[in-house]
UniProtKB/Swiss-Prot annotation:
HAMAP family: Ribosomal_bL32. Residues 1-18 have a biased composition (Basic residues). One of its GO terms (cellular component) is large ribosomal subunit. Pfam families: Ribosomal_L32p. This is Large ribosomal subunit protein bL32. The gene is rpmF. Residues 1-25 are annotated as: Disordered. Keywords: Ribonucleoprotein, Ribosomal protein. GO terms for biological process: translation.
Length: 63
């Protein structure tokens, strides 16, 4: 039966497992209620600069 040659630390083990999760899970997106563009949840919209009904990032009028 196989056995480890050396102890694998929690940090090293978690780094290895994180690579698997990063490759298998797709990023979740939601539509911005202000402009309708897809954006990441809990972040300001990259297109219009709104978050939770407020303009938090100044955007140019023509973009």
């Amino acid at each position: 039966m196989a056995h480890p040659k050396a102890k694998v630390s929690k940090s090293r083990r978690d780094k290895r497992r994180a690579q698997f999760n990063a490759r298998t899970k797709a990023a979740t997106t939601v539509n911005c209620p202000n402009c309708g563009e897809p954006t990441l949840p809990h972040r300001a919209c990259r297109h219009c600069g709104h978050y939770r009904g407020r303009a938090v990032v100044a955007k140019a009028a023509n973009s």
